[in-house]
Amino acid sequence: MNIETLVLGPLQTNCYILNFEKEALLVDPAADAELIMKKLHEKEWSLKGILLTHTHFDHMGAVDAIVKATGAPLYCPYKDAPGLRDWGKNLSLHFTRHTMQVDTVPAVLLHEWDTVPFGNERLRVLEAPGHTVGSVCYEGEDFLFSGDTLFYHGYGRTDIPGGSEEQLSQSLSRLLTLENRTVYPGHGQPTSLEDERIFFGF
């Protein structure tokens, strides 16, 4: 399995494309649906699903257009689903002065320990509240999509609607107890759980 990164949108959000043979899975299609679709067409990849780590506007701006073009199912954390249509929760007006909502109805609302099969992997859902009420991470055999919970030498904001410093601290502690994996965050460069354990003195 290969993982490619596109940095998209006004907040430079990482959109990840997982590829196995001729199939693809998207994580957080932030913006620029045309660019994402161009990539899929160039590679002749069939899109099998779209995963959201949370429902802030900068992680889901291309969802509707991509679903319309491909019919791919949307997987959304159930506790964060209200943010798909609520601009107060998805922060679109707060950051851009424009409201944004996702009209696509999720095919699957994800809960703790659910798995998403793809290729030779089963991505496991780990609830990681703190940045938002319903943030999740997706754990693979040797990688972790951490959304805005864990960054390279940092972590997501909690001074926003739905944020909780206490919950984020608990989520970070949980992630840092996992076996070492490459971490693909919502913003910035990849890291590893081993490096972050050292950085946080865990």
Regions from the language model: what does each represent?
Residues 32-117:
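Active-site HxH/HxHxD metal-binding segment of metal-dependent hydrolases
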Residues 18, 53, 128:
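Conserved S/T- and glycine-rich ATP-binding loop of Class I adenylate-forming
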Residues 29, 54-55, 78-79, 140, ...:
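Short secondary-structure boundary segments
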Residues 1-3, 118-122:
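Conserved N-terminal entry element of GNAT/NAT acetyltransferase domains
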Residues 24, 90-93, 122-202:
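Metallo-beta-lactamase
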Residues 4, 51, 75, 108-110, ...:
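Hydrophobic/aromatic beta-strand patches that form the interior of the parallel beta-sheet core
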Residues 29, 60, 168, 172:
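Aromatic/hydrophobic pocket-lining residues that form the small-molecule binding cavity
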